[in-house]
């Protein structure tokens, strides 16, 4: 519509209840030029923030190529308006069709900027930690990586986040040791010492 002289148009936009700050740290395995993990952080409009993490099978360049291709494909599907669940199912079917025998894990954390609800989708990834004000919550995966159609395709969990909470996603380089429960417990203890607002 056209405005007549002297008229003004005012638009009201609801402010989001939550804002997300991203941070990352990665390093290569000793002797490798590149890290086999790929990650991305994206705000999709004013509605949700999405964190993606993929760990390619093996190490180095090949693992990096596999995980990067998977993350880029998932980003393209989400940008096209496809839901996270359906996007993972499509990737699952595509990997099964290729049948190359190489599997990359997927961790997807989707945060509603309106409600603070965290939707966590995990396919073969490691534990995800939520640092609350007075506690640390550990979320363990059960589903296998995409391409392994045995049982569940991916885990789906919902969690409520509050002001100052932190969502910490890690790959097997942090937790894959002989004594997994002890390492995971130490990780929880370390995260618990992080100060939140």
Regions found by a protein language model. Give the residues of each.
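Acidic loop->beta-strand submotif enriched in PP2C/PPM serine/threonine phosphatases
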Residues: 32-46, 106, 139-182
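PP2C/PPM family metal-dependent serine/threonine protein phosphatase catalytic domain
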Residues: 14-38, 92-96, 126-158
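Catalytic core of PPM/PP2C metal-dependent serine/threonine phosphatase domains
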Residues: 1-8, 64-133
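Active-site-proximal, acidic helix/loop segment immediately C-terminal to a metal-coordinating Asp/Glu
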Residues: 58-80, 161, 165-197
């Amino acid at each position: 519509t056209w405005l007549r002289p002297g008229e003004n148009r005012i638009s009201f936009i609801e402010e989001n209840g939550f804002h997300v700050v991203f941070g990352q740290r990665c390093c290569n395995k000793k002797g490798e030029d590149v890290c086999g993990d790929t990650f991305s952080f994206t705000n999709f409009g004013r509605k949700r923030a999405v964190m993606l993490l993929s760990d390619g099978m093996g190490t180095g360049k090949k693992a990096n190529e596999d995980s990067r291709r998977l993350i880029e494909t998932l980003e393209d599907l989400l940008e096209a308006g496809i839901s996270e669940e359906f996007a993972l199912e499509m990737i699952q079917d595509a990997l099964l069709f290729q049948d190359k025998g190489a599997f990359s894990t997927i961790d997807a954390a989707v945060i509603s900027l309106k409600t603070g609800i965290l939707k966590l989708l995990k396919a073969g990834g490691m534990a995800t930690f939520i640092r609350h004000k007075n506690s640390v919550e550990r979320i363990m995966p059960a589903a296998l990586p995409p391409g392994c159609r045995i049982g569940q395709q991916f885990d789906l969990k919902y969690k409520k986040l509050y002001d100052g909470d932190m969502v910490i996603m890690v790959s097997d380089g942090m937790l894959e040791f002989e004594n997994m429960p002890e390492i995971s417990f130490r990780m929880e203890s370390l995260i618990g010492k992080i100060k939140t607002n």
